[in-house]
């Protein structure tokens, strides 16, 4: 099978997204590499739990890993967010943690407002609406 060397899957959930993703992060990275993907984004639901395993697997097979998450603001539709650099990763961790602290660690709902997302530096944290203008930062 011919690989898709310029293709990057930018929204992929692992088995850490309960009832949404079924594969282990390592399996997803391995499959993406075997298909010849340029990159793979792990975007679990309100969690970065699959990122460490995915990072180790991506390093092993030589595929670029994009770190992200799906957040569910209480006043807006779900958003896919990607970290474009180390600061973006820190922002994403902070955003997810603040949602947990507001809610009290319930996995059912996170108390993240759309304004919480907007408060972060857009050069570090991208939403799906912004990705077309910033793909160089991701890939």
What residues fall within each predicted segment?
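Phosphodiester-processing cores and adjacent nucleic acid-binding clamps
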Residues: 1-139
């Amino acid at each position: 099978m011919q690989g898709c060397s310029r293709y990057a899957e930018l929204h992929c959930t692992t088995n850490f997204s309960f009832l949404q993703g079924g594969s282990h992060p390592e399996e997803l990275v391995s499959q993406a590499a075997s298909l010849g993907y340029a990159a793979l984004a792990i975007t679990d639901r309100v969690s970065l739990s699959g990122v460490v395993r995915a990072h180790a697997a991506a390093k092993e097979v030589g595929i670029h890993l994009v770190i992200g998450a799906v957040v569910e603001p209480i006043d807006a539709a779900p958003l896919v967010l990607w970290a474009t650099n180390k600061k973006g990763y820190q922002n994403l961790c902070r955003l997810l943690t603040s949602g947990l602290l507001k809610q009290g660690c319930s996995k059912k709902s996170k108390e993240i407002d759309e304004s919480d997302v907007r408060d972060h530096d857009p050069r570090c944290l991208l939403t799906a609406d912004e990705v077309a203008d910033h793909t160089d930062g991701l890939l």
